[in-house]
């Protein structure tokens, strides 16, 4: 039996640093801007004078390109970037809710509120409109529902492409829109603030005064 092939894992790039750089000369990217070709030993000395490391970043260039940077800080930044990317990949996912072409108003409002919440958290969403039995002959109702969803979610998202049929299911995808979500949150916070204000006292200025 053949062994199942697994995809190769990506490894972090490794850099030659300081004494590991054996070529006679290098092109140095200077921290203050610009580049300069110099002997490798001079570049190492320059790095030492600035309490930095000489790091080879483009070994295949002629001559190899190096930069002056703290090697420990470079590795830290790379690790942080990897962690942030993994965190983003974990939190962003596809959420799905199902509808029917004859979904009533209460069910529509309830499910749409959930889709809206998913989008506000930065997730993509898919609304799946399922046609049972002979209801497939009423495809127009599915498209009407898709348009209602698009209008309802337009405050936080954009529809990703046109609604698409696959068998007896109509799929509608939505992408969160950061600017729309920020505006939505501001308006909601303002509405909540106004709702929390105490009611104004009644205006009695127009009432006649009692005769003494």
From Swiss-Prot:
Localization (cell): Cytoplasm
Chain segments carrying region Disordered: 192-212
A cellular-component GO term for this protein: cytoplasm
Record's keyword terms, sorted: Cytoplasm, Initiation factor, Protein biosynthesis
GO biological process: ribosome disassembly
GO molecular function: ribosome binding; translation initiation factor activity
Domain of life: Bacteria
Chief place where the protein resides: cytoplasm
Family statement: Belongs to the IF-3 family.
Subunit structure: Monomer.
Primary role: IF-3 binds to the 30S ribosomal subunit and shifts the equilibrium between 70S ribosomes and their 50S and 30S subunits in favor of the free subunits, thus enhancing the availability of 30S subunits on which protein synthesis initiation begins.
Protein name according to UniProt: Translation initiation factor IF-3
Species of origin: Chlorobaculum parvum (strain DSM 263 / NCIMB 8327) (Chlorobium vibrioforme subsp. thiosulfatophilum)
Gene (name only): infC
């Amino acid at each position: 039996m053949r062994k199942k092939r697994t995809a190769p894992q990506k490894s972090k790039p490794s850099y030659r640093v300081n004494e590991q750089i054996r070529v006679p000369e290098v092109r140095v990217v200077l921290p203050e801007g610009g580049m300069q070709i110099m002997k490798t030993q001079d570049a190492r000395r320059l790095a030492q004078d600035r309490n930095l490391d000489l790091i080879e970043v483009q070994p295949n260039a002629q001559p190899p390109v190096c930069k002056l940077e703290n090697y420990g800080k470079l590795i830290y930044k790379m690790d942080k970037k990897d962690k942030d990317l993994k965190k983003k990949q974990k939190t962003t996912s596809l959420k799905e809710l199902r509808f029917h072409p004859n979904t009533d108003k209460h069910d529509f409002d309830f499910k749409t509120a959930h889709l809206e919440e998913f989008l506000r958290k930065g997730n993509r969403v898919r609304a799946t409109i399922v046609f049972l039995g002979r209801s497939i002959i009423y495809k127009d109702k599915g498209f009407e529902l898709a348009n209602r969803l698009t209008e309802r979610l337009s405050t936080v998202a954009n529809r990703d492409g046109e609604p698409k049929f696959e068998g007896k299911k109509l799929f509608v995808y939505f992408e969160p829109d950061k600017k729309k979500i920020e505006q939505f949150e501001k308006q909601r916070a303002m509405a909540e603030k106004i709702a929390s204000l105490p009611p104004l006292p009644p205006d009695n200025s127009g009432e006649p005064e009692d005769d003494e």
